[in-house]
Amino acid sequence: MAVQQNKPSRSKRGMRRSHDALTTSSVSVDKVSGETHLRHHITADGYYRGRKVIAK
């Protein structure tokens, strides 16, 4: 079983955790329907970049 030789400092702990921050997902608003959607994804109505791409 692995056992640490020395206790990691607060600085090293912080350096390790520096990449753990959560980021918010970028959301766009469609030109035609005004609906919010994820970037590079179609809206729930089937619009992408102002054009109807899926007919429901």
Curated annotation (Swiss-Prot):
Keyword Ribonucleoprotein (UniProt): yes
Pfam families: Ribosomal_L32p
Signal peptide coordinates: none
Keywords from the named record: Ribonucleoprotein, Ribosomal protein
GO molecular function, one term: structural constituent of ribosome
Coiled-coil segments on the chain, per record: none
Membrane-spanning residues: none
A GO-annotated cellular component: large ribosomal subunit
GO terms for biological process, alphabetical: translation
Region feature (Disordered): 1-29
PANTHER family: 50S RIBOSOMAL PROTEIN L32, LARGE RIBOSOMAL SUBUNIT PROTEIN BL32
UniProt similarity note: Belongs to the bacterial ribosomal protein bL32 family.
NCBIfam families in the cross-refs: rpmF_bact
Name of this protein: Large ribosomal subunit protein bL32
Organism: Pectobacterium atrosepticum (strain SCRI 1043 / ATCC BAA-672) (Erwinia carotovora subsp. atroseptica)
Gene that encodes the chain: rpmF
